[in-house]
Structures are given as C-alpha cells and as structure tokens.
Amino acid sequence: VMDNNAIERERGITILAKNCAVTWEGTHINIVDTPGHADFGGEVERALSMVDGVVLLIDAQEGPMPQTRFVTKKALALGLKPILVVNKVDKPGARPDYVVNAAFDLFDKLGATDEQLDFPVVYASGINGWSSMEEGAQGEQWGPDMSALFNTILAHVPHQQGDPLAPLQLQISALDFSS
C-alpha cells in the first residue's frame, strides 16, 4: 500500500520514504517506510533523522538481506533501539530461530550497544494480519490482530519529548500526492 510509485510497484522495492499514521489505544503512531538499498541512502538518512525508534522487518524464511545491513547500520549509529519483527512465520520453510540469531549477529557486527542488543522480538504474518510475542504459537495464541506489535512499539519506542502547548513548528521534508 505504501509503495505507490510505478517503479516501486514494478520492481517490488521501496525507493521513496513514505509515512502513515495510526492511533493505537489512544496513542498516535507515525510509521515511516524507508528504502533498504544503499543507492537510496539519502532517503534513508532523511527518514531516520525524524524517528524515535525502528522496527526491523525480516522475512522468516529468507533472513536478513544485504540491504538490511545498510539501513540497520544507519539506525544503530543514530542510537535507535530496534524492535525485530520476524514476518511470514506461517510460510513453509520459515526459520524464525535462525532469523533472530542472524539479526543479533548482524547488530553485533555493526557495533550495537548492549542496550541495542537487548531487543524485543515480535513474530508476525503481515499478510494475515496477526502478531505474537511467542514463537511457534498456534491458533488463538497468535491473537486476532497486530496487538503484539503495536503494544511492543508503545512499550519500547521513547515517547516524543516537547511541550504540546508550545507554538507549532515543523520542517517539511517531502510532498507527495496520490489519487
């Protein structure tokens, strides 16, 4: 849904950073989808400069991809604390244990702090719309929705600092239109 550029849809990749917002249990959450490839580094750096946390989504069968390294290195260097989402855990051949271990090894190789290495893990099936804190949970234990993911975001991403009564200030970073 967020990749609405014709080239992005054709190639199945994210080129331009996108954002959307959701409200979960009374909290406004801004979600930014960044490109993963080093060729789009400017977009990645611009987007990461505006966020308070990072959710790293890794396919349960494929594991970390080369582009995962690029974005993760940038996020860790900014001191962002990752939340790992192992997606497509219901896919045949899924290897969630491998993905968690590979992500830990990647974070360590990229110089993550001890605090960044102590990351929460959420297991999910994005296409089927559910998430869980339990690997290998089946049926009702999965939960009917993305509650586990959103609750993890609320628990682990720092709340925005600032005075809500202060005059509005904003920096325009991109303009886009979709019909």
Feature-to-residue mapping (PLM):
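Conserved catalytic-core segments of large NTP-driven translation/proteostasis enzymes
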Residues: 107-179
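Conserved C-terminal guanine-recognition region of P-loop GTPase G domains, centered on the G4
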Residues: 23, 48, 54-116
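Non-catalytic, charged/low-complexity accessory segments that flank nucleotide-binding cores
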Residues: 3-4, 91, 97, 101, ...
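P-loop NTPase switch module centered on the Walker A-proximal segment
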Residues: 1-58, 62-64, 71-72, 102, ...
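Short acidic, glycine/serine/threonine-rich loops at helix termini
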Residues: 42-44, 66-69, 93-98, 127, ...
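Hydrophobic, small-residue-rich alpha-helical packing segments that form membrane-like cores
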Residues: 14-17, 74, 150-157
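Hydrophobic face of alpha-helices
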Residues: 41, 65, 100, 146-150, ...
